[in-house]
A protein has these predicted regions:
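Hydrophobic or amphipathic, alpha-helical segments that drive membrane association/targeting
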Residues: 1-149, 166, 186, 191-250, ...
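DG-centered beta-turn motif at the end of beta-strands
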Residues: 179-180, 260, 316, 504-509, ...
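Envelope-exposed proteins and targeting segments
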Residues: 133, 154-156, 297-299
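Short alpha-helix carrying the canonical HExxH Zn2+-binding catalytic motif
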Residues: 169-185, 498, 502-507
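Membrane-embedded segments
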Residues: 141, 158, 163, 169-175, ...
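Cytosolic-facing loops and C-terminal tails of multi-pass membrane proteins
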Residues: 4-8, 225-250, 269-503, 515-619, ...
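Active-site recognition of the HExxH zinc-binding catalytic motif
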Residues: 121, 160, 175-183, 187, ...
């Protein structure tokens, strides 16, 4: 199943889940309404304490306003409780991690094990094309577990327990993080965080019952006894509804966990890493336990489940290990777990030594990296298989992971050692937009002073020399690593930053592709993070024909200096997407202003329509037989806007600009 099929299946599954939860809530509300109607009948004085079912029905028939009022009241209580929980989690995955006692892992951490965790997450981020998520460690959790949370990749966070950080080797940690990244890529986080809100609403019913019990427990009156009976019924109903919701939740979660395991192995090409992590947990009963008070809220998010049978949110360890190793025999689980412990110690020590050496290198000047020399443009050979490129979306491979490690190690020392503070991240981002032309640069720095103050201008000027040395291949990957710091900006600061970015880009009266891509990615991340927006995926290709024409025209124009060849490239690609009817080739003089809103509207395409669109874009780009860095960056930006993250499609090491390669057939 490819990324688009998984997205379509996830949407279908989400709809069924919403219907199932709505049915559960409706049943709970119906029973609650009947109970409270009975209480109203009793309190009216028309009936004795022992109320027959027919009497309640008669009362309901003659007092419909009472029934409606109780139904609306209980529905409102559940929905408002769910809404309040959702609003509490609006900040995304970081809020979930913080609620469990998590601590943010900073870029400049000196703990080798946390440094290793951070490195693994950074590499996965670069390889998958997903903005760098926040990284958290649950310091007080000795069990081995992890989770990814957030509304979308723009506000995602990955949290790992201290037990996992202390116990797992690098390859095992990679397997776990790959598993969590698959949840980010497949849209599981959004469903999980919505589930937290819905289940909280059902839990609130039981909470109301407990409150009534505490308030009425001391009363010996008949009224007090009646209230205790009512409160007990509320507790039972609330938790029965919650149990039903958790059964639904667990059934959905188990399928998602199987898919995440498979995606992790596809990502790392090392089933032994994920297998080792599972054996580390299976070898010690209860070793995946989370002790935080809110652990039940996130049970469906965890890498390993602590719940059993009907409520198990994960397949059994035996089933998960057997999927990775068909020769596995369930009875050998304890022996394999013990063997894993005995073989891991020396490997782990060697691995930690390598991570420690990287920490020491942070304080030394870079000697040879991709930052040496002036930035370069490049072209590359790329087997042009539009279907193959489109299928890479959401499916990073081992080669992408290896390339990501090269990119991470090639980043400037100054960038690698800076902390995730919002101020430093903002400085590095703005430095990427400062022109080399002295006149334009002076104008931009004046804009910066006006918007952020003289001290911020001085901070940006301080990092300008390093930013100027940054190789073109590394500019956007470096920007993606800044997002955890940028997310710490307050709402007003983000709006100021986004406005300043727009002014800096327009300072020279033109927009190049890098500037457009940077501006779009930052807008996409910060604005989506603020609004927690996600595309609905309901439009087909025909309904979006106008926006598709704008996109293909810009891609063709930017990749071909000759107008005739640009038109041919446009026709070659768009005919694959809209074979029957399509707009003629026209390019707006202000291509960036036309493209930005078109991309925003195209987010709402159906998953399989997005696949066809990406295939057509690759055909247009490949028309001249070359893939340039600006074209590759624009394609990845388009894919990111469509919420279809594309792994790197150019080699990690820059190709000398004098060399030209012919794209494969």
């Amino acid at each position: 199943m490819d990324f688009y099929a998984r997205q379509a299946a996830a949407r279908t599954q989400s709809r069924w889940l919403v219907l199932a939860l709505a049915a559960s809530i409706a049943v709970v509300v119906a029973v609650l309404t009947w109970m409270m109607t009975a209480v109203s009948a009793f309190r009216s004085g028309d009936y004795l304490l022992h109320i027959r079912r027919s009497s309640v029905a008669e009362f309901a028939a003659t007092h419909p306003q009472v029934v409606i009022s109780w139904a609306l009241l209980w529905t409102a209580i559940i929905l408002l409780a769910s809404l309040s929980k959702s609003l509490m989690l609006r900040g995304g995955g970081g809020d979930v991690a913080r609620s469990l006692g998590g601590t943010r892992v900073e870029r400049d951490t000196r703990d080798p094990r946390l440094r290793r965790l951070r490195n693994v997450v950074e590499e996965m981020s670069i390889a998958s094309g997903v903005p760098m998520p926040e990284v958290w460690v649950l310091e007080h959790e000795s069990g081995i577990n992890a989770f990814a949370a957030g509304h979308n990749p723009a506000n995602a966070a990955i949290a790992v327990t201290r037990g996992a950080v202390a116990t797992l080797r690098r390859d095992e940690l990679q397997g776990v993080i790959g598993h969590e990244f698959s949840h980010i890529l497949n849209g599981d986080m959004r469903l999980n965080i919505r589930l937290m809100g819905a289940l909280f609403g059902l839990m609130m019913i039981g909470g109301i019952g407990k409150t009534i019990i505490r308030m009425s427990g001391a009363s010996d009156s008949r009224r007090g006894g009646a209230f205790l009976i009512l409160a007990g019924a509320l507790v039972v109903l609330g938790y029965l509804g919650l149990a039903l919701g958790r059964i639904i939740q667990a059934a959905v979660s188990r399928d998602r966990e199987r898919l995440a395991d498979a995606s992790s192995v596809q990502f790392t090409r090392n089933p032994n890493g994920l297998k080792g992590a599972l054996l580390a947990i299976a070898g010690v009963p209860g070793s995946s336990t989370i002790v935080a008070a809110d652990r039940e809220d996130i049970a469906h998010m965890l890498f390993a489940s602590g719940m059993q049978r009907w409520f198990a949110t994960h397949p059994s360890f035996e089933e998960r290990v057997r999927a990775l190793d068909p020769s596995f025999v369930a009875g050998r689980l304890p022996q394999l777990a013990e063997k894993r412990v005995q073989s891991s110690n020396q490997d782990d020590e060697d691995d930690l030594l390598a991570e420690s050496n990287q920490i020491e290198m942070l304080t030394k000047p870079a000697t040879a990296s991709l930052t040496a020399g002036a930035p370069r443009a490049a072209t590359a050979s790329l087997p042009i298989d539009p279907v193959g490129i489109a299928l890479q979306v959401g499916r990073p491979q081992t080669a992408h992971l290896d390339q990501a490690r090269q990119h991470r190690l090639a980043l400037p020392v100054e960038l690698r050692q800076f902390t995730d503070s919002s101020g430093q991240a903002r400085c590095w981002l703005l430095a990427q937009l400062i022109s080399r032309d002295a006149t334009v640069r002076g104008r931009q720095l004046d804009m910066l002073s006006e918007a952020l103050g003289q001290s911020e201008r001085a901070a940006v000027e301080l990092v300008l020399p390093v930013a100027a040395r940054l190789d073109n291949f590394l500019r956007l990957p470096a920007v993606l690593q800044l997002f955890p710091g940028l997310r710490r900006l307050a709402r007003a600061e983000r709006e100021t930053l986004l406005g300043l970015i727009e002014r800096l880009i327009l300072a020279d009266g033109r927009i190049d592709l890098f500037e457009f891509c940077l501006g779009k990615l930052v807008n996409l991340s910060l604005r989506d993070e603020l609004g927690a927006r996600t595309a609905q995926g309901s439009d087909n290709l025909q309904s979006a024909a106008g926006d598709i024409a704008v996109l293909f025209a810009v891609i063709a124009q930017q990749g071909n200096s000759d107008a005739v060849e640009a038109r041919r490239a446009y026709e070659a690609g768009i005919s694959r997407v809209l074979p029957m009817e399509r707009a003629a080739y026209t390019v707006s003089s202000n291509w960036a202003a036309a493209l930005a809103p078109a991309l925003t509207r195209l987010q709402n395409l159906q998953p399989f329509a997005k696949r066809a669109l990406i295939e057509g874009l690759v055909v247009t780009i490949a028309h001249d037989g070359q893939l340039t860095l600006p074209e590759a960056e624009l394609l990845r930006t388009v894919c990111a806007t469509l919420q279809c993250p594309l792994p790197p499609i150019l080699p990690a090491v820059p190709i000398d600009e004098a060399l030209q390669f012919t794209l494969g057939e």
